[in-house]
A protein has these predicted regions:
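Outer-envelope exported proteins of Gram-negative bacteria
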Residues: 112-116, 151, 161-169, 215-221, ...
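Extracellular loop and loop/strand-boundary signature of outer-membrane beta-barrel proteins
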Residues: 45-48, 59, 83-90, 97-99, ...
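Outer membrane beta-barrel transmembrane domains
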Residues: 41-47, 52, 99, 103, ...
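Cleavable N-terminal export/targeting peptides
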Residues: 1-36
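Repeated loop/turn-to-beta-strand initiation elements of outer-membrane beta-barrel proteins
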Residues: 68-73, 108-113, 160, 211-214, ...
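Short glycine/proline- and aromatic-enriched beta-strand/turn motifs that initiate or cap beta-hairpins
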Residues: 25-85
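Structural signature of outer-membrane beta-barrel domains
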Residues: 47-49, 78-82, 118-122, 169-175, ...
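Outer-membrane beta-barrel translocator domains and adjoining extracellular loop/strand segments
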Residues: 52-58, 75, 81-92, 123-132, ...
């Protein structure tokens, strides 16, 4: 048995994550006559920032499995959301992002990587509604990310697995701030934030039910980033979202922890739920809640 731990535990994005980081269990454990090499996953949820509103998001991903390897393409949309409590200079933005990921297993060691590209639409109307000021801003922004992770699966009996991991990400994101002008108007100034983030953590998964189709999991990680605003949280288990408050970032260290659940409705369909929260983040603490459904064929 190879319980595909990351596929269940990373269920959400992201961002993205944003639902799986390895091949679905159904595709690898199914008999040869019922092998399922393709899967489609749709997710939605919201990242809630303490005191500064929330950011809804949705994603659709298509995965092709090749034995112990996979390739995945995911499209993600992150809404600008509400910005209650954000600085008046903040110009909210929505993000559309495509992520290409791939991974493979060599024995118990899993290697996963991704590259993401996106564009950001700055919402001048939302800024005007919140501040009562008009703003001149002609440009839109962009986002880019790339990362690599190593995971080692340690079986704990026949129905549980512990998976320590280490990961590194590079992210670049555009933000915009308002500069006050005479006469009650403002001008938008675009800038780019970029940074490197490292994470070290572990996940644990318990499988149960008929054919071990159901699961519950726990996740915890310590992260350090050279820029906590650039970190785009493409991996779904990470609660930080694109552009924390759309403000310039700083170097930061924090912890993330969460829980997941998956309900296998059949060999081809499962429902997924994930809740992840930050602790010790210099910006507003974030809680990410995600629900999704997966189909394999």
């Amino acid at each position: 048995m190879r319980p595909i731990f990351i596929a269940r535990l990373a269920a959400t994005i992201a961002i993205s994550a944003v639902i799986a980081a390895a091949a679905p269990a159904a595709a690898q454990d199914a008999p040869a006559t019922d092998k399922r090499d393709w899967s489609i996953t749709a997710t939605g949820g919201s990242t809630i920032f303490a005191g500064t509103g929330d950011q809804p998001f949705a994603s659709v991903g298509v995965t092709r499995n090749f034995g112990d390897s996979y390739v995945r393409l995911t499209g993600t949309y992150v809404d600008g959301g509400s910005d209650d409590g954000a600085p008046l200079s903040t110009i909210p933005a929505s993000t559309r992002q495509m992520t290409l990921g791939a991974g493979t297993y060599v024995g118990a060691l899993g290697v996963d990587g991704y590259v993401s590209l996106g564009d950001r639409r700055f919402d001048r109307r939302a800024f005007t509604t919140r501040t009562g000021q008009t703003i001149a801003l002609d440009s839109n922004g962009a986002s880019f990310g790339a990362g690599l992770s190593l995971t080692y699966e340690i079986p704990l009996g026949d129905s549980a697995v512990l998976a320590p991991f280490v990961a590194g990400d590079y992210s670049r994101i555009s933000i915009a701030r308002a500069l006050a002008l005479p006469g009650g108007t403002s001008m938008g100034e675009e800038s780019r934030e970029d940074g490197i983030t490292g994470s070290l953590g572990a996940s644990a998964l318990w499988l149960f039910g008929p054919d071990q189709r159901h699961s519950v999991g726990l996740y915890a990680a310590a992260l350090t980033s050279s820029n906590n605003s650039a970190y785009n949280g493409t991996n779904a288990t990470r609660a930080t979202a694109l552009g924390i408050g759309d403000q310039p970032g700083v170097s930061d260290e924090w912890i993330e922890y969460g829980a997941t659940a998956a309900l296998g409705l059949s060999a081809a369909v499962d429902l997924q739920l994930a809740v992840v929260r930050t602790a010790g983040f210099l910006g507003p603490e974030a809680t990410s809640v995600t629900a999704g459904v997966g189909f394999s064929f």
